[in-house]
Amino acid sequence: MSSNKYIINVKNADMPDFMQQDATECTIKAFEETNIERDIAMIIKKEFDKKYSPTWHCIVGKSFGSFVTHETKNFIYFNINKHSVLLFKAG
């Protein structure tokens, strides 16, 4: 994995540092596997469901608005290059 070609900028987070690190690493791996936004979101969501128990939601794209309710300590919104990633647990 070549993380040097990815610029990550966390915009907002209510999540422990170790989970933020997992989120960014998982996202880089997903981008290494595919460039299809829906598939990237699915990879991240499934990994977090497995690692931190369901139910996680993930949105990946270049332009979107959002307003969500999330469980405490289970939210991150960050940019990776020209994409944005919203990952949160609810339900």
Curated annotation (Swiss-Prot):
One of its GO terms (molecular function) is dynein intermediate chain binding. One of its GO terms (cellular component) is cytoplasm. It is found in: Cytoplasm, Cytoskeleton. It comes from the Eukaryota. One of its GO terms (biological process) is microtubule-based process. Its main location: cytoplasm. The keyword Membrane does not apply. It holds the Pfam family Dynein_light. Keywords: Cytoplasm, Cytoskeleton, Dynein, Microtubule, Motor protein. Belongs to the dynein light chain family. Acts as a non-catalytic accessory component of a dynein complex. This is Dynein light chain, cytoplasmic. It comes from Dictyostelium discoideum.
